[in-house]
Amino acid sequence: MAQIAASIEYEAARPPDGLPDDMEPLPGASLRFLSIKAIDGFKIQAALWQPEGIPPTDITIIVQVHGSGGNLTSLPLRVIARALSARGYAALSISARQHDEHVNTDNFFDVRRDIEAAVVTAKALGFRSIILQGHSLGTVQAAFYVASDWDPTIKAVVLTGAFGKLPWKSRHILIQDEERYRALAFASREALKAGTAAEVLPIKMRWLGGVETPVTPRHFLTYRDEQASAADGTYWIPRIVRPILIVRDEADGIVLPFEPYMLLSAAQAEGSLVPSIRYVLLPNQRPSSREGHIFADNTEALTDAVATWLGEQRL
């Protein structure tokens, strides 16, 4: 008799505490919450937005992955999900294992299980056409997943606020201190040998906006270390076999103007598997800021850009 060795499961869940005021569906759409168990047992909170009166088999669903320390309510995920669920699309937004206070503690390779659980859940709910969207740190997680899983149900990829080459950026733009970088790299390797890769290092890492943040060895090695990290969008993007949309706000103070072009160059290089890619830069005359990175004052232009591109892809 066959036995179940591992499984992905989902069930209805109560809404998380402290939801933003606009975490309400527009007329003609609905919002409910799920608890999803990944194959390794990790519990994922998820928000399912969908148009009313249309069977899932006739709807394209956007599986959304947030950025560093975000969650299922983060911008720009919720504004895209809210707006497009009133235009005939569904969205499944997840809180991945590096959400909120767990930022900079995860292993890059483990987040794949969160995305896998969301994709499998979407298919179990009846959806047959999936778009994978990643924002900020979620862009390289999404790119890795799609590049390494040619699931025909996944039809396209949307990357908002996408970094170019995160290990290089971490060392030379964020940390900007070779002595500190080498100390983090050495301490992380020593912790790995000692079996304590999940424990926070005694050395903090210089991060976004110059903030000194706690970090685990497994996070540093798999995301930030130039030799060991796999969080390199320029490596994964040419291995994606689906159409790709990249969107950046002109006022983005986190992703630098040249970074999307690193991804474009990689996607268009000789031998790339990418069938088509488009880069949309949304005009914004405000000074560069963290708010620009999350499209805080450009939400309508963002949702229009995504909806227009999806329509062109006949999705």
Where are these regions (language model features)?
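N-terminal cap/lid segment of alpha/beta-hydrolase-fold proteins
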Residues: 4-55
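Short, surface-exposed "cap/lid" segments of acyl-processing enzymes
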Residues: 52-87, 93-98
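Residue-level signal for short, function-critical loop segments
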Residues: 67-68, 136, 250-251
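Short beta-to-alpha linker loops that shape the active-site pocket of alpha/beta-hydrolase fold enzymes
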Residues: 68, 90, 95-102, 163, ...
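Catalytic nucleophile-loop/oxyanion-hole region of alpha/beta-hydrolase
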Residues: 72, 97-131, 296-297
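A conserved amphipathic alpha-helix that caps or lines the catalytic cleft of carbohydrate-
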Residues: 81, 119, 145-146, 264
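Primarily recognizes the serine-hydrolase "nucleophile elbow" in alpha/beta-hydrolase
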Residues: 129-186
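Serine-hydrolase catalytic core
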Residues: 190-287, 296-303, 311
